[in-house]
Amino acid sequence: MQHFVGRNNELNDLNAKYQSPNFEMIVIYGRRRVGKTALISEFIQNKPAIYYQGIESTGDMNLKNLSEKINDLKNDDFNTASYADFEKAFTEVQNIANHLEQKLVFVIDEYPFLARSEHSVSSILQYVIDHVYKKY
């Protein structure tokens, strides 16, 4: 079994935020190929998580793929429909979190790809964070 090497300080910081009783939003950024995704993957092990990687495609395709990731966590094999819009998808993430014993980690990797595919997604996410997520 390979152990996670390096980034222990960052991993400890993420785990401390996870233990916080408050909503936490963390942005991880940096040059390409420096281990950001590996850090995130290590952090979400053994935690309820939705991991979504944005793609260079259309907003509709990103919404469809995000919807699949949300439905995967819900173990909803029968619901293959996409959410009507990103606001509904992001709000459903909180609905799922409300029914879990542990905090839910919601990861959007390669966010710039998602933001380029759907120009309103950043303001939608900000709205949902301010009006839905921060209530909890």
Named regions from a protein language model:
Residues 1-136:
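Phosphate-binding site recognition
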